[in-house]
């Protein structure tokens, strides 16, 4: 019997830094692990600044969403982790650009992040019908 949980992968999907999947698909829902502002080829942070990392994060997030059969306008909920709330205004600007259509629910928290990362976003999205 096939598993009800499908692991999402693809050429443009960044490799995770631990023993977890970039995303899983269950029926019409896509559960995306925390994506970060890393270069998908090297796994290293895409720069030292918040803006650089956030822009790369949104490129990575879009790649994972598309690999799982979804898109930004179908994201229902996000969990945003930032290393410093001083970037909150810039986060709002970039978040609004990426989710310009049907902005999702969002929870934002300040937490320490590993490996020089400044932001991480996980989400739940609907799969295109």
Feature roles, as predicted:
Residues 2-129:
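Short, polar/acidic, helix-capping and beta-turn segments at strand->helix junctions
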């Amino acid at each position: 019997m096939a598993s009800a949980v499908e692991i999402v992968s693809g050429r443009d999907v960044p490799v995770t830094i631990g023993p977890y999947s970039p995303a899983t698909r269950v029926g019409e829902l896509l559960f995306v692990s925390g994506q970060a502002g890393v270069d998908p080829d090297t796994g290293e942070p895409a720069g030292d600044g918040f803006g650089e990392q956030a822009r790369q994060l949104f490129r990575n997030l879009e790649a994972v969403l598309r690999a799982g059969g979804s898109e930004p306008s179908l994201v229902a909920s996000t969990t945003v982790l930032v290393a410093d709330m001083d970037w909150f205004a810039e986060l709002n600007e970039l978040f609004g650009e990426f989710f310009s259509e049907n902005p999702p629910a969002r929870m934002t928290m300040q937490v320490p992040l590993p490996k020089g990362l400044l932001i991480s976003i996980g989400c739940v999205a609907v799969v295109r019908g």
